[in-house]
């Protein structure tokens, strides 16, 4: 971490003394990974007597849209990543209402699991997306968890169906592009349908899609065409996956409401939500 901090300051042409605020991801996530960043932030902020702020990782993803666009309130946010599949309603900065979440597996997690069973290298999401563009929806897989009136998601059944299908057949007998296309079509249709349901309940000025899976070309195309009557915001690909810029911009807005302190005892919150 020391080398990373030194390199970052060098590329930014800044000295530690010129930093105004130190922000670090406090959760959710794996506690070991969180502690690496938190311990480094505690020490850095203490050494240079800078205010310190712990930031919700999910808030960072939401504010990744603000890096290149101006969020217009109220807004609906779909966060899709390896660890999360959530719908949020935003009425103002840091005024966030959770509407729905996954009750089991997150979308990105399922992508990686299917890719592993197809012997595709990690990370599997981009490769499945590429293969899906070459295939057709010939398997007609179930659109899971739509026979209800809530805004939650469930992808464990779809994952199990695909894993069992691959296990029962020889990989060489499977049309992998068609299977990827069928899987991706199922997932995207579910995300689209749940988003449509949310929009019938909440009036918004923007629809924002963030998280690692927001880089998926099929998802981007589907949402841009399905919600053409609404301003749809996707971050650039570099801001979809985890990066420091989103934590920095989230901290900027968070600090305007909850001022950072000069207490250097931040701890990890692996189950942090809203």
Curated annotation (Swiss-Prot):
Enzyme class name: transferase
Binding residue positions for substrate: 79-83, 112, 125, 129, 216
GO molecular function per UniProt: metal ion binding; N(6)-L-threonylcarbamoyladenine synthase activity
The protein's Enzyme Commission number: 2.3.1.234
A cellular component annotation (GO) from this entry: cytoplasm
Binding positions (Fe cation): 57, 61, 242
Reactions the enzyme catalyzes: L-threonylcarbamoyladenylate + adenosine(37) in tRNA = N(6)-L-threonylcarbamoyladenosine(37) in tRNA + AMP + H(+)
Location(s) in or outside the cell: Cytoplasm
Cofactor(s) for this UniProt protein: Fe(2+)
Free-text function comment from the UniProt entry: Required for the formation of a threonylcarbamoyl group on adenosine at position 37 (t(6)A37) in tRNAs that read codons beginning with adenine. Is involved in the transfer of the threonylcarbamoyl moiety of threonylcarbamoyl-AMP (TC-AMP) to the N6 group of A37, together with TsaE and TsaB. TsaD likely plays a direct catalytic role in this reaction.
Family: Belongs to the KAE1 / TsaD family.
Protein name: tRNA N6-adenosine threonylcarbamoyltransferase
Source organism of this protein record: Aster yellows witches'-broom phytoplasma (strain AYWB)
Species lineage: Bacteria, Bacillati, Mycoplasmatota, Mollicutes, Acholeplasmatales
Gene name per UniProt: tsaD
């Amino acid at each position: 971490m020391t080398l990373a901090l030194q390199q970052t300051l060098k590329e930014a042409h800044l000295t530690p003394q010129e930093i105004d605020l130190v922000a670090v991801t406090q959760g959710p996530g794996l506690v070991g990974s969180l502690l690496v960043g938190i311990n480094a932030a505690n020490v850095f902020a203490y050494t240079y007597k800078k205010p310190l702020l712990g930031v919700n990782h999910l808030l960072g993803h939401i504010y990744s849209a603000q890096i290149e666009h101006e969020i217009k309130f109220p807004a609906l946010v779909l966060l899709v990543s390896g660890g999360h599949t959530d719908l949020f309603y935003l009425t103002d900065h840091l005024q966030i209402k959770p509407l729905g979440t996954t009750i089991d597996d997150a979308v990105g997690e399922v992508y990686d699991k299917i890719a592993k069973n197809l012997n595709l290298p990690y990370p599997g999401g981009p490769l499945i997306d590429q293969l899906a563009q070459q295939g057709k929806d010939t398997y007609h897989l179930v659109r899971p968890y739509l026979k209800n009136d809530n805004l939650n998601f469930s992808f464990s059944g779809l994952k199990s169906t695909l894993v069992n299908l691959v296990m029962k057949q020889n990989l060489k007998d499977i049309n992998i592009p068609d299977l990827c296309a069928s899987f991706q079509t199922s997932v995207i249709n579910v995300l689209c349908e749940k988003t449509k349901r949310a929009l019938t309940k909440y009036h918004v000025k923007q629809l924002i899609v963030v998280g690692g899976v927001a880089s998926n070309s099929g998802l981007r195309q589907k949402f841009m065409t399905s919600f053409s009557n609404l301003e749809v915001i996707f971050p650039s690909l570099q801001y979809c996956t985890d990066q420091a810029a989103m934590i920095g911009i989230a901290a900027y807005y968070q600090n305007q409401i909850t001022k950072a302190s000069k207490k250097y005892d931040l701890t990890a919150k692996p189950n942090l939500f809203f």
